[in-house]
Amino acid sequence: MLDSLSVLNFYSLASLEVGQHWYWHIGGLKIHGQVIAVSWIVFAILIIASIAATRKIQKVPSGIQNLMEYVLEFLRDLAKNQLGEKEYRPWLPFIGTLFLFIFVSNWLGALIPWKLIELPEGELAAPTNDINTTVALALLTSLAYFYAGISKKGLGYFAHYLEPIPVLLPIKILEDFTKPLSLSFRLFGNILADELVVAVLVFLVPLVVPLPLMALGLFTSAIQALVFATLAGAYIHEALESEHEEEHA
């Protein structure tokens, strides 16, 4: 009896969802449409900003070109600080794309009360408000640092699992599983909590009252994007760096 109840409780918990999803049915698949729809908005913002900044490039930058150059310098310094002068260039596009996508997604979630926008079914939300998005970004990061290690060291990359002593093999394997989990849940939890608090306050009180909290949400959203991109760079650097280099660092 207790076993059957525990199984029922497990399945009831597994069926719980955060928010009301806007489902798209494609073939036999059911996907979260709000993630794709708002992701398109994020892509559109980034593409339009890039075109506007590079349409008329001037030797003395001004306006949006000046802003874009500042962003590029910031991303270059971020990648260089994590990967070093020799290794950062090939990985700058990946780390920069991660940062910009997460940053714009987070700010859209902090600035726009998506949950108050009524749809025939479900609700809109920032892409990073969905655990599937954050897990996908974390898995991409995992694939990136595995690729970095294998491309530089070949199959010898996996020898680090046996260092400094083979008995640590289970812990090293567990560490590689916890890296994407920590990245995804940290980002998901922070963005979801911020959106929920702002949505509830906007619903209960006049818009002026939640403004300070929205400003704090903007700061937190930027920090989360920076943390994710920084850790991604650190993990890739760890995969590229040999044990000999670590000892002399």
Swiss-Prot record:
It is a multi-pass membrane protein. Gene3D superfamilies: ATP synthase, F0 complex, subunit A. GO terms for molecular function: proton-transporting ATP synthase activity, rotational mechanism. GO terms for cellular component: plasma membrane-derived thylakoid membrane; proton-transporting ATP synthase complex. The chain crosses the membrane at residues 33-53, 92-112, 131-151, 196-216, 217-237. CDD domains: ATP-synt_Fo_a_6. It is found in: Cellular thylakoid membrane. Keywords: ATP synthesis, CF(0), Hydrogen ion transport, Ion transport, Membrane, Thylakoid, Transmembrane, Transmembrane helix, Transport. The keyword RNA-binding does not apply. InterPro entries: ATP_syn_F0_a_bact/chloroplast, ATP_synth_F0_asu, ATP_synth_F0_asu_AS, F0_ATP_A_sf. F-type ATPases have 2 components, CF(1) - the catalytic core - and CF(0) - the membrane proton channel. CF(1) has five subunits: alpha(3), beta(3), gamma(1), delta(1), epsilon(1). CF(0) has four main subunits: a, b, b' and c. Belongs to the ATPase A chain family. Key component of the proton channel; it plays a direct role in the translocation of protons across the membrane. This is ATP synthase subunit a. It comes from Microcystis aeruginosa (strain NIES-843 / IAM M-2473).
